[in-house]
C-alpha cells in the first residue's frame, strides 16, 4: 500500500510546486548584486515560461527567451523554444536548482565552474479568465475564419499574474520575429494591455490598447484595433491543445 501511495503523492507534490511558481516575477539580484540597470520580467503558466528584458533608464529592448519548463522537487529544467541573446540554447535543456525562500525564487546553476544565482521577486500570482499560455490558430477577415496549425513557426501569448508577453518565432530555424509585453486586465469582455517593451519599435512603449474578448469553446476570440491601427480578429487556442510537438 505504501508503494502505491508514493507515486501519486510525489506527483501531487511536484504539481503543487509548479503551481507555486505560476504568475509573474521580476529579477532583483544576480550573483549577489542588485539588478538596477535593466528590467527583466518572467512569466510562468501551464508548464511554459517567457521573459522579456529592457533597459531600466530607457525603453530599449534587450532580450527575450522562453519555452517549456519542468519542476521535480527543487530540480528545475528549462527547454528553450526561443532565445534572442543565445541562439545556441534553442532546442536544448538547461538544468537548475530552484528554491522558494521568503516568497522569492532562487534559481542557481554552475557556469564555467562557478555558481550563478538569480533571485526573482513575485509581482503577482493573480488569475482571470484569460490566464493561460495561448497559441494563435485562426483569424477572421471579412466574416470568414481561416484556421492554421501551429508548427515550428508559431506565435504564442502567455498571460499570468497581470502580465502578458507575445512572441513570434521559429523553433526549428531559430528565427525570432518579434515580441512585446507589459501589464493587462481582462474584465467584462474588455481586454486592455499597456505595453512596457516592444522589440520592433520602442516608441510604442507606454501605449494602452483596448480590445474585446470572448472565450468560446475554450478558445480566446480577440478583436479590435492593432497597435498599428488596423482591425484584427484573432483566435487563440490553449497551447497544449493547439501545438503538438513533432515526433522524434
Model segments located where?
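Bacterial Sec-dependent N-terminal signal peptides
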Residues: 1-22
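Lipid interaction determinants
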Residues: 18-64, 70-179, 187, 192-248
